[in-house]
Amino acid sequence: MVNFTIDQIRHMMNMTHNIRNLSVVAHVDHGKSTLTDALVSKAGIISKKAAGDARFTDTRADEQERCITIKSTGISLYFEYDPETIDKQAAAPLNPTEEGDPTEEDIEIKQNSYLINLIDSPGHVDFSSEVTASLRVTDGALVVVDSVGGVCVQTETVLRQALAERIRPVLSCMCNKLDRVIAELQLDPEEAYHKLMKSVESVNVIIATYPDEAVGDIQVYPNQGTVAFGSGLQQWGFTRKFARLYAKKFGIDETKMMERLWGDYFFDAENKKWAKTDKKDERKAQGKKPLKRAFVQFVLDPVYGLYRALNEGRTEKYMKMLDTLGVTLTSEEKDLRDKALVKRVMSKWLPAADALLEMIVLHLPSPVDAQKYRAPLLYDGPEDDEACTAMKKCDPNGCLMMYVSKMVPTADQSRFYAFGRVFSGIIRSGQKVRILGPKYSATNKSDLLIKSVQRTVIMMGRYVEQVADIPCGNTCGLVGVDQYILKQATLTDCESAMTIKMMKFSVSPVVRVAVEPKNPGDLPRLVEGLKRLSKSDPMVVVITNTEAGEHIIAGAGELHLEICLKDLQDDFMKGTPIKISPPVVEFRESVNQATTEPGLAKSPNKHNRLYVNVEPMPDGLAQEIEDQKVTPEQEFKERARYMSTTYGMDVELMRKIWAFGPNGNGPNIFCEATHGVQYLNEIKESVVAGFGAACAAGPIVDEPCRNVLCKLMDVTLHADSIHRGMGQIMPPARRVVLGTMLKAEPILVEPVFLCEIQVPRAVSGGIYGVLTRRRGHVFEEIDEVGTPMMNIKSYLPVAESFGFTQDLRGATAGQAFPQCVFSHWQAYNGGDPLTEGTKTNEMVKSIRNRKGLAPEVPTPERYLDKL
C-alpha cells in the first residue's frame, strides 16, 4: 500500500531542507534499477516481494525485455524516518514558505519526513546523454559499483560527469552484489574486504582528480557511513547498522565504533584491546592465529555465517542466529526455501532501503545547501544578478529560474512533458514564462519566446500526478510548452535573467544512418516523426540534406541508433514502414603539414585577392576547444597567453584570432597575420562566413574540418566598398581555405572507441584476433585478483565497430562483455587519400559516392586562382 498522498508530497516540497534530489548512476548491469526498487518498495509503491525483480523505474517494454535501462526515469518518494537514528545535526531550520512561518504541522513533518526526488539513469554508454540530463537536475549521485566487476569504464565516465557538475557522489557509493562475492567467487572474508576496499579506493582516485573548495571533501569513507555494502537483487544492505549494534552491546560511542569498522583495526578478544596490526609473527610464536580485522570479525563473519547457513538449509543454525539478532519469521516465511528464503531473511535483518535512506538523508545536500555552490557554476550570467542570487538562496519568493533538461513523451507519444528542475521561485499552472533557448545570450536575444504553462505535474515513474504549482528545489514536468522547446531550455519570469548553461555530453553522435519511407506518400509522416524523435532524445541529431533529399539520424553507437529507429517507426510514425541504410561513420578532414606558400583566391569581379596559409594545430588544442577550455568568449589576451604557454604558439598571432569554425565554436581557428592592410575590418564578417562554410564541408569528402589553423597572410582590396561586399569576399574566402588545405597534405580523420572488455581469463585469447581484424589494438590488461575475470582495454575505430559485440561473443563462447565509449579522433591509417589505390582513397571514393559527389577529389586548381 502506498504510504503517502500527493498532497503530502506537495506539502513536503515547501520544506527545502528536507528534500534530497539524487541520480542513481553506474556501469551497465551493476544493479541500479534493482537497488532503486528498494526505495520504491519502502515508499509502498511496489510490494517487498516484487522489489528487486520489478525494476519499477524501467518503464518501457524494451527496457524490461532487454533488462537494461534506456531512458532516465524520475520519481518522487515520501519517507518518514525514525528521528532517533538520525543525527540531530541533520535537522536544519525550516525555510519560511510563501504562506509565512512554518506551522506546527510543518514542524512535526520536519522532524521525520523527507522528500526524495530520485532519477534512475541508464548504465549503457550509448545512453550517456540521459545520465547527463538527470545529473543536471539533481544534487547528489548514488554511485553503484558491482563488488565483483569493480569500477568499470562507464562508472568512471558518469562519476566524472557528476563531479564536473559539482554533484556529491552520494558519497554514497553502494558496493552492490555482495551476494556474488560470497556465493560465486567464494572469497574468504579477508579477501572480500580487500575486494571491497579496491572498489572504494578506485572511486576515491577518480574523485581526487576533481578537487573543488566550494564543495569540500567529497571522497567516500565507509567508516563515516558514506559507503553502503549489500545486494540490490536480494534487497539487503548496511552502513552504520553494525556500529550501532556493537556500540549498544559494548556500551561505547557509535562514532568511535564506526571508525574502527574499516581499515587496519584489529580486535584482541582475549585482552579486550584494539591493535593497528594483526600481530601475525608475535601470535605465531605463541601458537595463536593472527588477529582478525574488525570489519571481518564484526561485519563480514556474521553476514557470511547467516548467508551460508541459509544457502545450505541448516535450519537450526540460522534460526538460532536470527533469535540472537532479534529477527522473527512468520510461519509462511519459515516455509520458504533457497533464494526466496535468503532474500526474505537477509532483507529483514539488513533492509537495503533503510541503509540507503540513512545515507541519502545524512550525507546528501538539500537544495538549499547544494545551490550555494552549484548556482555560480550553472548560471551563464553575472554571479551577483537577481536570478543567480535567487538560485544561490533557493528562494521561493525570488524570480523563477527553471532548467528543462529533457523532453519525456506522454503515454500516447503525441505530446511531451518538459522535465526539469526549479532552482528558484515557484512555477504555476497557467503562468506566463520566458522560454530562453540555447542560442539566447546578452548579445543575441532572438532565441526567446513568452508562453503560458498549461499544467505542472509530478513525475512518478510511469505515471504523472497533477499539482497546482511546484516550488524551488524540486524536479517536475510541464505540459503545454513542448512545441516551443527542442531539447533543453531555461524558463524564467525575470527580464534580466540569462540562461542556465547548456549541458555538455560525454559522448558524440558519430554513427549515422539515412532513413526514407518505403512509400513516398509517407514522407510528411517521416518528417514529423523525425521532429518528435529529435525532441525525445537529448543526444540524437537529425540532419536533413535538402540537396541530396536524404534524412540522416546520428547517434552515439549501434544500440543507441537501434533504439532511436525503433522509437521512430513504432511510436512516432505509428508503425509506418521505413527503409534504413547501413550505418556509416562521421569522419573529419584535416591537414598533415603546413603549406610552404599561401594559396590565392580572387573575388568574382577580380578586384580583391585573399592569400591564406594553413597548418595543423598543436596536439591537444582541438580537444580543448571541443571541451570548451578554449572558447571564443574568453578574454583574448588571456587566451593568447594560455595558448602561447601551453602550446608554444605565437602570442601576437593568437591575439588576432578572427573566428573558430564551424558554427563559431568548432575545433578550427582563423587568424589574421597581415601587415598594414586598409579596409581589413570591413571584410572580416565576410571572410569569417567563408571560413565557417569551408570548415563545415571540407575539400575531400564534404565532412567537417578539425584541427586546422588558417592564417590570412595578405589581402588586396578595391578602394570602393561597393566592390568588396559579402558576395565578393565570402566565396573566395571559402575557396582559398579549401584549396590551400588540398596543398597541405590533407588527411581523413576517424573517430575511435575506447573499448573495455570483461572476459574470463580462460577464453580471452579469441579477443586479440577479433580486434586485429578490425584495426583495433589492446593497450592495457588488468587481472581481477581473486576472480577468473580480466579487463582488457583497447582502441577500436568506430567504423569497424558494427557487429563487433557479436564477433566477440562468438570468439569467446558468449562470455565477453564489451563496453565502447567514444575516446578520440585519429588519422585514418590507410595511406594518402589523394593517391589512387590506397585504402584511404577507396574510403574517400565510397563516401563521395554515397553523398552523390563526383568520384574524383577536386585538385587545388579548382579552388585557387593564379596571379
From Swiss-Prot:
The protein, known as: Elongation factor 2
GO cellular-component term (any): cytosol
Primary location recorded for the protein, binned into one broad class: cytoplasm
Keyword Hydrolase tagged: yes
NCBIfam families: small_GTP (TIGR00231)
Modified residues (Diphthamide): H723
MF annotations from Gene Ontology: GTP binding; GTPase activity; ribosome binding; translation elongation factor activity
EC number: 3.6.5.-
Reactions listed under catalytic activity: GTP + H2O = GDP + phosphate + H(+)
Annotated residues for binding of GTP: 26-33, 176-179, 231-233
Pfam families (alphabetical): EFG_C (PF00679), EFG_III (PF14492), EFG_IV (PF03764), GTP_EFTU (PF00009), GTP_EFTU_D2 (PF03144)
UniProt-listed InterPro entries: EFG_II (IPR041095), EFG_III/V (IPR035647), EFG_V-like (IPR000640), EFTu-like_2 (IPR004161), G_TR_CS (IPR031157), P-loop_NTPase (IPR027417), Ribosomal_Su5_D2-typ_SF (IPR020568), Ribsml_uS5_D2-typ_fold_subgr (IPR014721)
Family: Belongs to the TRAFAC class translation factor GTPase superfamily. Classic translation factor GTPase family. EF-G/EF-2 subfamily.
CDD domains: aeEF2_snRNP_like_IV (cd01681), eEF2_snRNP_like_C (cd04096), EF2 (cd01885), EF2_II (cd16268), EF2_snRNP_III (cd16261)
Keywords for the protein's UniProt record, in alphabetical order: Cytoplasm, Elongation factor, GTP-binding, Hydrolase, Nucleotide-binding, Phosphoprotein, Protein biosynthesis
Function description: Catalyzes the GTP-dependent ribosomal translocation step during translation elongation. During this step, the ribosome changes from the pre-translocational (PRE) to the post-translocational (POST) state as the newly formed A-site-bound peptidyl-tRNA and P-site-bound deacylated tRNA move to the P and E sites, respectively. Catalyzes the coordinated movement of the two tRNA molecules, the mRNA and conformational changes in the ribosome.
Keyword Disulfide bond attributed: no
Localization, UniProt: Cytoplasm
Domain named tr-type G: residues: 17-368
Free-text description of this protein's post-translational modifications in UniProt: Phosphorylation by EF-2 kinase completely inactivates EF-2.
Modified residues (Phosphothreonine): T57, T59
